[in-house]
Curated annotation (Swiss-Prot):
Organism, scientific name: Azoarcus sp. (strain BH72)
Keyword Cell inner membrane among UniProt keywords: yes
InterPro entries recorded: ATP_synth_B-like_membr_sf (IPR028987), ATP_synth_b/b'su_bac/chlpt (IPR002146), ATP_synth_F0_bsu_bac (IPR005864), ATP_synthase_B_chain (IPR050059)
SUPFAM superfamilies in alphabetical order: F1F0 ATP synthase subunit B, membrane domain (SSF81573)
Taxonomic lineage from the root: Bacteria, Pseudomonadati, Pseudomonadota, Betaproteobacteria, Rhodocyclales
Protein name in the entry: ATP synthase subunit b
Length: 157
């Protein structure tokens, strides 16, 4: 009988220990485990959120780089267009200056040719008078001489 009484006593002690453990020990352990699980879940959620934020930031960076490249391309195209426009304007200005210089040179050449013709006419008139004077071997009156030169000059024109 001792075996039965010991067994019953051990069962009673076991149930008291189980009840005590369930009442006082188990709730703090469960609470600690729940808190730990919550911290782990929060950490995983934060990691997932950080990963999503990183992906979003990478997308933003890629978009900003694309915009920057586009903007750089636009700036480069604008600069090339402006440079081309400046070159065209410089060419037009150079053409205008060359045309003006050509016109001025042609006008100067025409004026020089006209002056040369006038000088040549004067020389021809003087030579003709000198030749006529030598042929006639006589002195011509200065007034008559001037009239002859003017008439000869008019005829040569």
């Amino acid at each position: 009988m001792n075996l039965n009484a010991t067994l019953i006593a051990q069962l009673v002690v076991f149930f008291i220990l189980a009840w005590f453990t369930m009442k006082f020990v188990w709730p703090p352990i469960v609470k600690a485990l729940d808190e730990r699980a919550k911290k782990i879940a929060d950490g995983l959620a934060a990691a997932d959120k950080a990963k999503a934020d990183l992906a979003l930031a990478e997308k933003k960076v890629v978009e900003e780089l694309r915009k920057a490249r586009e903007s750089a391309g636009d700036v480069r195209a604008s600069a090339e267009k402006q440079a081309s426009q400046l070159v065209d304007e410089a060419r037009a200005e150079a053409s205008r200056i060359i045309a003006q210089a050509r016109e001025a040179a042609e006008a100067e050449a025409g004026a020089a040719a006209q002056r040369a013709k006038e000088a040549l006419r004067d020389q021809v008139a003087h030579l003709a008078v000198a030749g006529a004077e030598k042929i006639l071997r006589r002195e011509i009156n200065a007034q008559v001489h001037a009239e002859l030169l003017a008439n000869l000059k008019q005829e040569l024109q």
